[in-house]
Regions:
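Amphipathic, charged-and-aliphatic alpha-helical interface segments
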Residues: 157-174
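A short structural micro-motif
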Residues: 9, 98, 172-173
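Feature representing long, continuous alpha-helical segments
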Residues: 17, 35, 61, 69, ...
Length: 183
């Protein structure tokens, strides 16, 4: 960071607040992605189950065979930590008085902690989770075959009303979409 006004730099820590806020924004987005991964991998029977995360430890103590999404969970916890550090940095920047802010030590500590934690979390997420994600093809095929959303593709050909009628009938009768037979 280039300091243009050294007097301002001893009074105000807004540059550090900006950096911390950017880290917080990254943490929020990373946490949201991890929550999506947890939801998409939930199961084995009653969740979404559309993707498989690499198993990192023995499953749940209350549900043998279940794979817990431990990597997305730990990354989400790091995001909570970074968000908390951002609050600390914001409060420390605000707590300065007049020409001096005596709370720079906690700002530096929190900022370096956030950077270190986020770096480790991203590396762990990529190495131990993202690179090992696979699609649960059987589950996805099953969901597509039971989806009435596929009738949307019919709208340009038969109109919205007829497509909606087919969708409603499919829901009532549990008729499934199947691929056309090869000829």
């Amino acid at each position: 960071m280039c300091i243009r006004d050294r007097f301002d730099a001893t009074e105000n820590l807004d540059g550090f607040v900006t950096i911390s806020n950017t880290l917080k924004t990254c943490a929020v987005n990373l946490s949201k992605m991890c929550n999506d991964l947890r939801l998409l991998s939930s199961g084995p029977r009653t969740g979404f189950g559309e993707i498989n995360l690499p198993p990192m430890q023995n499953g749940s103590s209350i549900m043998p065979g279940k794979i817990n999404p431990v990597i997305p969970e730990v990354v989400t916890q790091v995001a909570f930590h970074v968000i908390g550090n951002d609050t600390t940095i914001t409060m420390a920047a605000e707590a300065g008085q007049m020409e001096l802010n005596a709370f720079e030590p906690v700002v530096f500590y929190s900022l370096f902690s956030s950077i270190t934690s986020m770096t480790g979390a991203v590396n762990t997420l990529v190495k131990n989770c993202i690179l090992g994600i696979t699609a649960n093809e059987k589950r996805c095929e099953d969901l597509v075959s039971k989806s009435v959303g596929i009738t949307t593709a019919l709208c340009p050909y038969i109109g919205y009303q007829k497509a909606a009628s087919i969708a409603k009938k499919s829901l009532k009768t549990c008729l499934l979409y199947t691929s056309p037979s090869p000829r």
